[in-house]
């Protein structure tokens, strides 16, 4: 039997070991997912082929080294241009040029948008190639146990279904070397002494902001002294990302504050900080908090500035989880855990309004006392290996199989089932029984591993948190009664669209493909395990079963169209109706139920 998600012609695959460029795979896979014109065919030699039909009966053909029923294909580059009288290889630049100029593939696009898109895609490709070449960790990222810092800085590829997963327009190469995680960036923060009246801060869970701030600076005697000196002058300290400082000093209000010495830059002090996979969030081993900054860089689909409304909502979330009923849902050192964002601080302008570019949010660091713990962001576990070889998740499953004397097939099934129990089911449980929705994409899920096997997870980045009618029914006193006026009130349509996309398609389907591309297990087998875990939760009796039933039975799931969102130059965070960038993707979970009833 020829497997549906087979590693094609394994005995010949060594010749192709370095011909799959993961950044191009991300580009091609996002196009195939969104364009009905892309064809996935059987070639005459029995290999799968990715075919792009062009005008005049020409086509671009790319053999696959791995065909995924879920769309995470791997390729044998270079692409081949087939014309009536010749076959020639295409460079990456030529491949992209052919695609953006073919209306049958991408529709009618203005020349200006084509130029912007092409520039960003090629920039992302170059960034990825630089990361692969200059990462301080290299093949270690795909073979060894990783701590949190290394895993965060080991995300070389980025979003697996995006045409430009490593686009960051405002960074120069020298900026990237300092501030990008994949190049091993590390730096000290600028610390400002700021007149107290110019600052706004917030804190939650009945802990005063000053208490949190003192804990943050306690590691460095110079910072402690600087804080004491500032307070004696009626000032407080404000940490600032060094790159963002160059943006902030152009703000008219901040220029004025500097001139009047209401703001004084004390220089770079304290701990060394490491950018995590999001670039704007920073980690310093051994400190009680990570820091999430506004960073005025367009990363993939959006500019990454914080807002006061967001920061307040994260404080509210932390307060909400002080409720005994919710606190009981969280693991204590294992199981499902939250990296809350319990505090923030930022500058006000001359009119008393928050300067978004100055905001910084505190994020709990559960690894403070154990920075060597194997805590690996899901995106690093699942990314395609640019050095040739298997994904990290496959390597960790192989390690677990060896330790436990299991077959790879058994180990893969057990590993994925544990992922479902520690990540998928708890997130659905919170949605279905408490009305709390977390947008759990691959960079928000940090798997807690022991000897490579899941024993828990940390959910991080509370930006995509929503509350349904059920949450307002259960926690109305905490959430208030003006739900329709709240941006984070989610009706059922919104829950189905976003929650299912991020957790099931973005995270879990990609994990399935990353496991099955390298181990002796079918994608359909892991889809069945996912189905049975979700169905067990449904059968246990939940308060709101609509989203669970949608995921288990709907013929299609709502999927975000990153390729065309990016091609049309949308800022995802400012589209009036983000639903316009979503489309229907066939749902393999519904097929499990169909087969069960045959």
Curated annotation (Swiss-Prot):
GO terms for molecular function: acid-amino acid ligase activity; ATP binding; transferase activity. Pathway: Siderophore biosynthesis; aerobactin biosynthesis. InterPro entries: Aerobactin_biosyn_IucA/IucC_N, IucA/IucC-like_C, LucA/IucC-like. The keyword NAD does not apply. It comes from the Bacteria. GO terms for biological process: aerobactin biosynthetic process; siderophore biosynthetic process. Keywords: ATP-binding, Ligase, Nucleotide-binding, Transferase. Catalyzes the attachment of a first N-acetyl-N-hydroxylysine to a carboxylic group of citric acid to yield N-citryl-N-acetyl-N-hydroxylysine. Involved in the biosynthesis of the siderophore aerobactin which is a chelator that mediates the high-affinity iron transport systems induced under iron-stressed conditions. This is N(2)-citryl-N(6)-acetyl-N(6)-hydroxylysine synthase. It comes from Vibrio mimicus. The gene is iucA.
């Amino acid at each position: 039997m020829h497997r549906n998600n087979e590693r094609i012609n394994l005995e010949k695959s060594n010749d192709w070991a370095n011909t799959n460029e993961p950044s191009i795979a991300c580009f091609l896979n996002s196009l195939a997912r969104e364009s009905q014109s892309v064809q996935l065919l059987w070639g005459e030699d029995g290999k799968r082929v990715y075919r792009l039909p062009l005008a005049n009966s020409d086509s671009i053909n790319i053999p696959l080294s791995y065909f995924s029923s879920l769309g995470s294909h791997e390729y044998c580059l270079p692409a081949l241009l087939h014309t009536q009288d010749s076959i020639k290889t295409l460079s990456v630049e030529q491949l992209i040029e052919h695609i953006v100029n073919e209306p049958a593939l991408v529709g009618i696009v203005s020349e200006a948008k084509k130029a912007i898109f092409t520039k960003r895609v090629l920039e992302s490709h170059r960034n990825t190639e630089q990361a692969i070449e200059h990462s301080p960790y290299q093949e270690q990222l795909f073979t060894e146990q990783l701590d949190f810092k290394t895993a965060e800085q080991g995300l070389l590829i980025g979003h697996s279904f995006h045409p430009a997963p490593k686009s960051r327009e405002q960074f120069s190469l020298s900026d990237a070397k300092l501030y990008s995680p994949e190049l091993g960036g590390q730096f000290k923060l600028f610390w400002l002494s700021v007149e107290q009246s110019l600052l706004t801060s917030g804190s939650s869970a009945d802990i005063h902001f000053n208490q949190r701030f003192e804990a943050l600076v306690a590691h460095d005697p110079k910072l402690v002294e600087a804080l004491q000196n500032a307070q004696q002058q009626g000032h407080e300290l404000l940490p600032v990302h060094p790159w963002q400082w160059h943006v902030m000093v152009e703000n008219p209000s901040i220029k004025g504050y500097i001139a009047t010495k209401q703001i004084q830059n004390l220089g770079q002090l304290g701990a060394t900080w490491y950018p995590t996979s999001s670039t704007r969030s920073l980690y310093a081993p051994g400190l009680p908090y990570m820091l999430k900054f506004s960073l005025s860089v367009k990363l993939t689909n959006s500019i990454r500035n914080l807002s006061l409304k967001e920061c307040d909502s994260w404080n509210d979330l932390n307060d909400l989880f002080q409720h005994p009923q919710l606190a009981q849902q969280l693991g204590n050192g294992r199981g499902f855990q939250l990296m809350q964002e319990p505090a923030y601080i930022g500058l006000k302008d001359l009119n008393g309004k928050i300067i978004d570019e100055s905001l910084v949010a505190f994020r709990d660091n559960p690894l403070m006392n154990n920075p060597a713990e194997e805590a690996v962001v899901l995106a690093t576990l699942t990314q395609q290996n640019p050095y040739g070889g298997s994904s990290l998740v496959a390597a960790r499953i192989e390690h677990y199989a060896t330790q436990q004397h299991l077959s790879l097939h058994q180990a893969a099934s057990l590993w994925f089932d544990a992922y479902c129990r520690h990540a998928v089911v708890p997130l659905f449980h919170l949605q279905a029984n408490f009305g709390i929705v977390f947008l759990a994409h691959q960079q928000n899920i940090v798997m807690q591993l022991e000897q490579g096997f899941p024993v828990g997870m940390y959910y991080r980045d509370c930006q995509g948190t929503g509350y349904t009618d059920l949450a307002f029914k259960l926690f109305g006193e905490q959430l208030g009664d003006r739900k329709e006026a709240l941006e984070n009130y989610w009706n059922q349509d919104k829950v189905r669209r976003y929650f299912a996309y991020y957790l099931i398609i973005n995270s879990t389907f990609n994990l399935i493909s990353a496991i099955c591309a390298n181990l002796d297990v079918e994608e359909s087998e892991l889809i069945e395990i996912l189905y049975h875990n979700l169905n067990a939760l449904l059968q246990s009796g939940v308060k709101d079963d609509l989203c669970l039933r949608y995921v288990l039975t709907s013929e299609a799931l709502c999927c975000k169209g990153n390729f065309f969102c990016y091609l049309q130059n949308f800022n995802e965070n400012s589209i009036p109706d983000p639903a316009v960038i979503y489309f229907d993707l066939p749902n393999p979970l519904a097929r499990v139920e169909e087969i069960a009833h045959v």
